[in-house]
Amino acid sequence: RRYDGARPLGAIKSTILALLYLVIAALFAAIGGMYIASLLGNTKFFMEFALFRGVKLTFVLPIILVIIAYLQRFPLWNGRMINSKEEAKTFVVEFLTMDVKLYVFFIIAALGGAVWVFVGRSGHTAGVPVPGFELMLRRFLENTMYARPREKEFIIGHPALMLATFAFMRKWPTVIHFLLTLAGVIGIASMVETFCHLRTPVFMSIMRGYDGLLIGALFGVLLIIAVRFMMYVTQWFQAREVDHE
């Protein structure tokens, strides 16, 4: 959908649409995940004569595609969209030759650390170690729910995707729902990644995604309510300051 300047939707309608779009995205993720699972249902993968090396790609590629889609549909770069080869070449040249402040390196380092953690903890091989408090949370979820949902889905991805949709419907600045969408893609990519575990039954992967979607949707609604409350409080204090002046 192209960027437009239409009036923002109401808060309740925006929240309902945020929940609806999260469910739709989760359904697409489940379809893609089951397709991958069907491809892996082969003796050579179970006997480990062949290894599936696309686990980390299922996590990284959606983020790259979202960045490209945003650059094509929203005026993110210098107030313009990038829809042709010439515009893409101009973007690359401008991006590589732009002035960079020192604080940008700290931001890049922080983002690089986050990417290292998320990508390193995906896949079948040992990567970034899991902290103790998260192991306790996992144990609690395993004992409480039918299938333990993934933390990056219901804590980060799904709530962020709902807030991104809410931000878009409410006509917040584009950069806000862009960053939130990048965070939201983590949850959707994680759902696809769940089906890449060879020895996990498909039904368990479906239930794991469903449990994560259920809790993530609840957290997303609570996050939207919390953000709305903070905005009302901020506006109230600003109005009081204006009255005192």
Regions found by a protein language model. Name each.
Residues 1-245:
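Alpha-helical transmembrane segments of integral membrane proteins
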